[in-house]
Amino acid sequence: MEIFNFGQASDHRRLPDFGSGGFLQSLDTNPFLKNQYYNNSVEALELCKKLNKMGISCDMSIWTKPEEPFRVDPGDFGAKTLHESFGFDQNLTGASQIHDGFRNFSSVRVQNNNFHGVSPSPGLLGLQDSFNPNGFEEMMAFKDHKDFLLDHINEPIKRSPFLRGNDAFKGSLMFEGIRVSQILAAMEGSGASYPDEPKINGGLPLDLVSMVEIYGSVNLMARDQIGCRALQKLVEEGTVLDSKVIFLEIIDHVVELSMDPLGNYIVQKLLVVSDEEQRTMIVSVLTSKPRELIKICLNTNGTRVIQKMIKTVKTKQQIALVKSALEPGFLVLVNDSNGYHVLQSCLEFLVPNDNKFVVEAATEYCAQLATHQYGCYVLQCSLINTVGLQHERLVAEISRDSLRLSQDPFGNYVVQCLIDQQVSSVNLLLPFRTHCIELATQKFSSHVIEKCLRKYPESRAEIVRELLSYPNFEQLLQDPYANYVIQTALSVTKGAVRARLVEKVKRFGKLQSNPYCKKIFSKTILKK
């Protein structure tokens, strides 16, 4: 069996300097090559200290030659003898040509391996990560397993079960924390070149197989900043094969990726670019467990995915799945800062017959929602996006309680929304009669009275008449809120109604120096 030793590589290439005195001079001093052996323990210890400063773990055992070969369970990886370097079978199906950067290395062997749909490169990466989290050069020796992926397109690229159960491996993934930037930076400067491949960030190869070789799986790649961007670009601009592989790799991890700070972006992208069959599969996974779906909706990242899902669903099957899963969680969603956005999306992007479940629930709980911080938004959205009988029922419920809602910090916005839609003023303003003074002198309800003056010309005379009949009219002029109501009345009224109001205001000319009365007594308003 032919063996290659990284320590004997003759093709020396400069690696990037991380600011540690330029100690990364060539492949001979690359800290990521785990097969380097130093006879001088002091020199090795110094290098370990430098690595630790960079946040890279360093075990002194990797600098010494093992006394006996280390063997991995053949059931997981085949018979591999680890003695100065890994051995690989040159005849392995799907193995690609060794890259130019390793032209001077001896041939590579893997013995008795049968991956059954598992890409040999991710398997190799997993093995390296498990025993030496800083090693990656062996992994770079394999590239472009396109033929292998084509043969196994329906089988996900996955790690060995042996590695998935290895706690040490889980805690030492090469892309965790700050080390991913250092390792990827080292790769860019290691001398490896990909002349005909598109790049991401000007350095790394934008090729699915190459990227999976780095990260180990599409699922893990989606959780990394660089990897996530690369996946989105591949889905949007890559080949059909790339898109299909990414979809098959991610579909089983959609729920957890939806709540991941980075992974949620690739799920959103798939919802947009996938065909109807693939989109139906994603919707089915997300809605299969209603409680899980509600949890995603309440998550800061997950709510974006669900909103995107609602925006992109088109078929009756997809819409039915969304409705049946969201309906039981209405009250939970409407009381949450993330959840209420999902209900708003239902109202905005689903047709009236499909968002009916939201409107009916909003009508039933109208009194509670109107005075709630988030519920008031759902009610306003319901008013804007409903028609016919549903709209009439909702308007009737709000109008019945308009006096109380007008004085509420949140309810006043719901009443103003009704006024903006110019619904019949008969029922809406009926509760306001004999209460205009009370409403005009309050912070929230004063906005409602101003809105009535602007939107309902038929109500202006009645409101002004009630203001003029107030015995302490002078007090209204100096009131921090009522003075705005009087200003608005002077601006919108005409004829005899306005003339009576102007005459009453001029009687209190002594108040024109009052800070609240300055605008009322301005020539512009009084001479209009």
From Swiss-Prot:
It is found in: Cytoplasm. PROSITE patterns: PUM, PUM_HD. GO terms for molecular function: RNA binding. Residues 188-528 form the PUM-HD domain. InterPro entries: ARM-like, ARM-type_fold, PUM-HD, Pumilio_RNA-bd, Pumilio_RNA-bd_rpt. Its main location: cytoplasm. One of its GO terms (biological process) is regulation of translation. Pumilio repeats lie at residues 213-248, 249-284, 285-323, 325-360, 361-396, 397-433, 434-465, 466-503. Signal peptide: none annotated. The keyword Glycosyltransferase does not apply. SMART domains: Pumilio (SM00025). Keywords: Cytoplasm, Repeat, RNA-binding, Translation regulation. One of its GO terms (cellular component) is cytoplasm. Pfam families: PUF. The pumilio repeats mediate the association with RNA by packing together to form a right-handed superhelix that approximates a half donut. The number as well as the specific sequence of the repeats determine the specificity for target mRNAs. Sequence-specific RNA-binding protein that regulates translation and mRNA stability by binding the 3'-UTR of target mRNAs. This is Putative pumilio homolog 10.
